[in-house]
Amino acid sequence: MTDKVIEFKGKVSGLVDETNVTIAIYGEDLDPDDISQQLGCQPTFSHRQGERRSHGSPPYKQGAWFLEVKGNAPHGPEDLTKALLMRLPADETIWVELARKYDIQMRYGIHMDTWNRGFELSPKLVQRISKLHTKLSFDIYAVGGNDDA
């Protein structure tokens, strides 16, 4: 019997390669200026219901307000989420009121250059996120192929 040796030719494990973290607020009657005033910061992008992305594009069905941070390893989801949250109010009553009127989402875009990457969020950060009364959404993209291993 011959022992086979499996050789890995690529990098496995480690922190995800690229991350986008976005707080997204949606609502039919959403006024982006009002949201900016309540949160004390300007959005990365926003629009009102009925506005158009460009001439000829369909009108938006609802208003939206987005604040996004992006980064690459070694800055992963934990660091970027903290950076995003530092720009937003910690007062939970603001978020309770917003969640009563609007759909709030914390969205993660996770990009990997190979098939095996990961990340963790600390208990303290998860507790802070919970005070936003938001859904969490994860879009995960693995652009590398199995030929890396």
Q: Could you say what each language-model-derived stretch is?
A:
Residues 1-119, 123-149:
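Acidic (Asp/Glu-rich) sequence patches and key acidic residues
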